[in-house]
């Protein structure tokens, strides 16, 4: 896409286009090499771990932090950090491994807890029991946010255009463009709004604009919840379960005060909340 933009911009100057394309190519290669460098193959067994063709013994492991930030850009930033007696540190970036949950479970249960095999957690939810639960809802207002105002403003304009359609074909073209732009913004922004319901046994996460879609977690199977900054005007919430499966939810509709109230509620249920984006002073 960027190359096409350069091509249009520099169509009258071929030398500038070539230089611009080469710059983009160098940037793409640099980023790709950075990802490859930080995503080597990993082999685990009960004796140790092979990382970047180097074998490390588990009996030399001094500390293991399986959740937390690793400082890698263009990713969620979550990683596992293993530190050995010689001060060697291994960072396993979550987003680079499709089986990261299995890797972390092995380290937690087999290496740290000395279990003979990995315990599997039952995530099946009793829907009847779920409806009986009294829950506190954290919803916010998805309309009166920057992205919400942009999205609904365009939709209102899309509905108003036919009423004032008196310029013929020009308005028809504008109407088609508004329809496309409104649909695009709806698809982009609707994923940014989630509401939460917290009861004694369950945490429910619902999409505000696709209310029939939801995630349900048992409170006693949640290991940690992370509040992080997604953009200048939006935060996000990551739910990490005890088997190290994780999912991120954008919460542009929830104010900082609402998130802090939710944090207090979660901590009251003995859930660790890692707040990386909101001042609590």
Question: Language-model segments: what does each one mean?
Answer:
Residues 1-40, 138-195:
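Alpha-helical transmembrane spans
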Residues 17-22, 37-39, 59-66, 117-124, ...:
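Short, mixed-charge, low-aromatic patches
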Residues 50-104, 122, 205-263, 276-281:
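Non-transmembrane, membrane-adjacent beta-strand/coil modules in membrane-associated proteins
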Residues 26-65, 183-217:
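Conserved beta-hairpin
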Residues 1-10, 87-89, 95-168, 244, ...:
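N-terminal membrane-targeting/pre-transmembrane regions
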Residues 271-272:
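Extended alpha-helical scaffold/tether regions of large eukaryotic proteins
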Residues 70, 141, 169, 275-276:
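Secondary-structure junction/capping motif
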């Amino acid at each position: 896409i960027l190359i096409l933009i350069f091509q249009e911009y520099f169509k009258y100057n071929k030398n500038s286009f070539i230089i611009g394309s080469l710059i983009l190519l160098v940037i793409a290669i640099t980023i790709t090499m950075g990802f490859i460098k930080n995503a080597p193959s990993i082999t685990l067994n009960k004796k140790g771990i092979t990382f970047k063709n180097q074998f490390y013994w588990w009996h030399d492991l001094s500390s293991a932090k399986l959740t937390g930030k690793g400082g890698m850009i263009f990713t969620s930033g979550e990683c596992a950090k293993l530190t050995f007696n010689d001060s060697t540190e291994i960072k396993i970036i979550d987003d680079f491994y499709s089986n990261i949950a299995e890797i972390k479970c092995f380290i937690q249960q087999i290496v740290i807890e000395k279990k003979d095999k990995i315990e599997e957690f039952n995530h099946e939810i009793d829907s009847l029991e779920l409806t009986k639960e009294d829950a506190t809802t954290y919803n916010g207002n998805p309309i009166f946010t920057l992205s919400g105002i942009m999205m609904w403003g365009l939709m209102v304009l899309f509905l108003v255009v036919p009423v004032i359609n008196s310029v013929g074909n020009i308005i028809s073209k504008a109407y088609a463009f508004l329809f496309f732009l409104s649909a695009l913004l709806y698809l982009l922004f609707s994923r940014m709004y989630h509401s939460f319901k917290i009861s004694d046994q369950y945490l429910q996460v619902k999409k505000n604009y696709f209310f029939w879609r939801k995630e349900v977690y048992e409170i006693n199977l949640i290991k940690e919840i992370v509040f992080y900054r997604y953009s200048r005007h939006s935060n996000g919430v990551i739910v990490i379960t005890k088997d190290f499966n994780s999912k991120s939810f954008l919460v542009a509709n929830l104010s900082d005060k609402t998130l802090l109230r939710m944090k207090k509620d979660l901590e009251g249920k003995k859930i660790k909340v890692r707040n990386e984006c909101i001042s609590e002073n």
